[in-house]
């Protein structure tokens, strides 16, 4: 790609399943300028990556969480006939299921991710270059309000 598009900036997203500083640094060495880390990472894991590579780091701060590790979901393909690993997740973990006793519920559905003031301050202290808000297929008003919320947190406004 660098040969055909030498001036293009390359970002590695969550589908690359970047789980440590070795993988992030490898991507930097082959020409990537930024990686989007999986939503499941702890602050300590993010900090360790930050301390061991100079690649830009981007972190999701709001949106749907998955029961699978980012980039490794096969449920959508099996249950919804759409690949979650190709950006077409059918969100089978958000569906209602019935167990063998006939009880129904959202057994696989984690709560949505929503970072607040303390989490944003931790990311700032770690030295994260960019935050990411899930906005695909969302109402424009939702996106506006969510982005405004995070802008105020970053700028430390009420």
PLM region spans:
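Hydrophobic alpha-helical bundles that form the membrane domains of multi-pass transporters
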Residues: 30-31, 136
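Short, glycine/polar-rich helix-capping loops at beta-to-alpha or helix-loop-helix junctions
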Residues: 19-23
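Active-site pocket-lining/capping segments in soluble small-molecule metabolic enzymes
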Residues: 1-18, 36-130, 137-158
């Amino acid at each position: 790609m660098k040969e055909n598009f030498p001036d293009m900036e390359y970002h590695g997203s969550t589908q690359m399943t970047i789980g440590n500083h070795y993988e992030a640094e490898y991507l930097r060495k082959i020409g990537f300028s930024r990686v989007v880390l999986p939503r499941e990472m702890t602050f300590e894991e993010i900090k360790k990556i930050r301390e061991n590579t100079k690649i830009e780091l981007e972190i999701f701060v709001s949106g749907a969480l998955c029961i699978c590790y980012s980039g490794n979901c096969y449920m959508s393909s099996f249950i919804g006939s759409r690949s979650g690993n190709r950006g077409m997740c059918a969100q089978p973990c958000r569906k209602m299921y019935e167990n063998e006793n006939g009880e129904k519920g959202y057994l696989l559905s984690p709560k949505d991710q929503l970072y607040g003031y303390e989490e944003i301050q931790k990311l700032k202290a770690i030295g994260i270059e960019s935050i990411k808000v899930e906005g695909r297929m969302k109402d424009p008003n939702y996106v506006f309000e969510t982005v405004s919320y995070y802008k105020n947190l970053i700028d430390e406004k009420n």
